[in-house]
């Protein structure tokens, strides 16, 4: 009866987190269910991550073009938003490196699969370059991977 009248687990429904842990393990991402937090959607997830990882005045990267909501959300938190050019060939690596050197952003919010709004997937060689630069400049990637299961081989 407590379940009906009480609040649920703040981290989210445990069986869901356990299932997510198994699915992530299938793609070699080890994440214990107790280290996970589920949200009601990507909007609240991005806002929660930005609040936890950034302070007002920090720089955050987004794809250019990007989903319009992200920019407004980040700016409301006092964050400086910088767009990184992206097209069917992937992220502009030279521009990304220049931005990382100049601004030292905390986060890069992106979709590598079925990017919104372009629907392009990042090519593997481009993904590896992005990952290399993120590691080199200590910038975290926030991957909005909502469309992953809409393409074959996933």
Protein language model features and the residues they cover:
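Conserved core of the PLP fold type I
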Residues: 3-138, 148-153
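Glycine-centered flexible beta-alpha turn that most often forms the glycine-rich phosphate-binding loop
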Residues: 144
